[in-house]
Amino acid sequence: MDWSNIIFAFSLTLFAGLATGVGGVIAVARKAPGERFLAGSLGFSVGVMLFVSFVEILPKAVEELTGVWGERGGNWAATGAFFAGIALIAVIDRLVPTAINPHEPSTVGGAVEGYERRSRMMRAGVLTAIAISIHNFPEGFATFVAGLTDPRIAIPVAVAIAIHNIPEGIAVAVPIREATGSRGKALKWATLSGLAEPAGAVVGFILLMPFLGPEAMGLSFAAVAGIMVFISLDELLPTAISSGRHHTAIYGLVGGMAVMAVSLLLFI
């Protein structure tokens, strides 16, 4: 077991998780990013995550599993694990009430704007933080596994997840600041919601450690690819397009794919 790889993977996960704190800083400074920038950045994240999932992570899972179970068995196992990852994150997504679900951006704002009392604003912020923490847990596992796999994959994935964590931090910090008048409390809750990602990495590592081998790694890679694809299509792309900058989001998506492709080609 190479502890330097484990530390590297965990550091990337911590970096991605703490990006919610960046969102908190933006919220308390009352300087929100423009719609064009947000659409392009989220679209870029979608491009990176989709491309790396289908071109690098899923094929690597097939390679690991076919080495154990043969071509037919390995391909079936990788496909099953891929859709199991999608099912896992979809179930988590459905368990979170719509009004506080960070994957339902159109309802979050309306719910928060409808609260007239500070106590309800505080409750909205805390519940949003809890909801985001639930969603960030498997994302942390995904980033961690990518870090164990290959830095070429891990760094762009961590950056992509960090980008989409920034608006989540804003969603937590805004109602808490309005409720308490405290920038410190708003920033604290925004940052804490992102710490679920390194927690996901730790739990994933503890669960995987006794089973580290081609089977466990191959199944994990495929499941992580499924998780990343679902997050991209269910959360990031709709959020980017909902800004009203449809073409900017798509240009960002293509740009993310192109950057990811070039970064992989440079290391062949």
Curated annotation (Swiss-Prot):
Binding-site residues for Zn(2+), renumbered to this chain? E139, H164, E168
Residue ranges crossing the lipid bilayer per the database entry: 6-26, 37-57, 73-93, 126-146, 153-173, 189-209, 211-231, 248-268
Query: Where primarily located?
Result: membrane
Cellular location of this protein?
Answer: Cell membrane
Report the InterPro entries cross-referenced here: ZIP (IPR003689), Zn_transptr_ZupT (IPR023498)
One Pfam family for this entry, by name? Answer: Zip
Q: Which residues form a coiled coil?
A: none
Please name the GO terms that the record assigns under molecular function: metal ion binding; zinc ion transmembrane transporter activity
**Protein topology in the membrane:** Multi-pass membrane protein
Which is a Gene Ontology cellular component entry for this protein? plasma membrane
Q: Where does Fe(2+) bind?
A: N136, E139, N165, E168, E197
Catalysed reaction(s) here are:
Zn(2+)(in) = Zn(2+)(out)
Q: What UniProt keywords are attached to this protein's entry?
A: Cell membrane, Ion transport, Iron, Membrane, Metal-binding, Transmembrane, Transmembrane helix, Transport, Zinc, Zinc transport
Family designation: Belongs to the ZIP transporter (TC 2.A.5) family. ZupT subfamily.
Q: Which PANTHER family match?
A: ZINC TRANSPORTER ZUPT, ZINC/IRON TRANSPORTER
User: Tell me, what does this protein do in biology?
Assistant: Mediates zinc uptake. May also transport other divalent cations.
**Entry protein name:** Zinc transporter ZupT
Gene source species: Corynebacterium efficiens (strain DSM 44549 / YS-314 / AJ 12310 / JCM 11189 / NBRC 100395)
Classification from the root reads:
Bacteria, Bacillati, Actinomycetota, Actinomycetes, Mycobacteriales
